[in-house]
């Protein structure tokens, strides 16, 4: 969903704006924001579960990277992407490329690392093991990534490089305007944090797909770089160290 505009102030607003006003006594303002915050259709525009997993599926190789960030109402979803997807399917059939050729332990690791880098939804750690299981990896910790490695990578190795809602300022349409998710995926690849040899649904490796897309460099405002990240790491703690008793 594209961000809305507050008709009274002209400021951009979204679903987070509505949440932040939930305790306000100004019922008129709450109603106005609720009606204007989410125009159109689609998923929540920030890096919530949907966009985290949409990015995950792109990086794991099951969707072309350039199709992830455009808004639901973007004309490309009707005028360009359908034919391109048919070409992908034709190529996969012709070359006998199956989902399990694409969704491997290495491509899932890539997608998890990107989820860290975008500060994505913690639900990724519910969905990723099930995706891995469907791909034939029954022991996620041993076959893909252990909890200890995840914590090490997110704390010491992989920074947050996107300033996105709900923790930041921008939405997926802003990421799209700066070149799409392929910008930060390439930056992570160039930094040596991803395996570029994994196969994708385009018939190319991840590195080959990124080379063809040739995304711009991170703009430093919406999309940051590994060298100059938005935040150095993900928060790792327990909000309830003594349990909720």
Question: What residue spans do the PLM features occupy?
Answer:
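Active-site cavity-forming subdomains of large catalytic enzyme subunits
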Residues: 1-110, 114-115, 132-135
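Active-site loops and adjacent core secondary-structure elements that bind or stabilize anionic groups
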Residues: 107-113, 129, 202, 216-219, ...
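Long hydrophobic segments that form regular secondary structure
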Residues: 98, 120-121
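Single conserved hydrophobic/aromatic residue that forms the stacking wall/gate
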Residues: 236-245
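Solvent-exposed alpha-helices and their adjacent loops that cap or buttress functional pockets
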Residues: 36-37, 48-49, 103-109, 164-167, ...
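Short glycine/serine/threonine-rich phosphate/pyrophosphate-binding segments
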Residues: 50-51, 121-128
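Terminal amphipathic helices with adjacent charged low-complexity linkers/tails
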Residues: 64-85, 127-171, 176-214
């Amino acid at each position: 969903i594209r961000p809305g505009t507050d008709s009274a102030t002209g400021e951009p607003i979204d679903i987070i704006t509505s949440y932040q006003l939930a305790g306000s006594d100004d019922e008129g303002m709450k109603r106005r924001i609720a009606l204007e915050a989410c125009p159109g259709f689609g998923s929540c525009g920030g890096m919530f579960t949907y966009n985290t997993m949409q990015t995950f599926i792109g990086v794991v190789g099951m969707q072309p990277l350039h199709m992830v960030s455009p808004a639901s109402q973007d004309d490309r979803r009707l005028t360009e992407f359908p034919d391109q997807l048919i070409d992908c399917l034709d190529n996969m059939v012709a070359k006998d490329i199956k989902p399990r050729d694409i969704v491997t332990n290495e491509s899932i690791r890539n997608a998890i690392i990107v989820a860290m880098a975008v500060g994505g939804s913690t639900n990724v750690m519910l969905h990723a093991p099930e995706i891995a299981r469907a791909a034939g990896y029954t022991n996620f910790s041993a076959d893909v990534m252990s909890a200890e490695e995840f914590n090490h990578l997110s704390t010491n190795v992989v920074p947050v490089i996107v300033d996105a809602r709900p923790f930041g300022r921008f939405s997926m349409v802003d990421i799209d305007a700066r070149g799409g998710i392929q910008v930060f995926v390439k930056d992570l690849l160039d930094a040596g944090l991803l395996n570029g040899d994994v196969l994708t649904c385009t018939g190319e490796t991840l590195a080959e797909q990124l080379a063809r897309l040739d995304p711009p460099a991170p703009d430093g405002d919406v999309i940051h770089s590994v060298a100059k990240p938005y935040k150095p790491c993900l928060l790792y703690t327990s909000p309830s160290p003594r349990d909720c008793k």
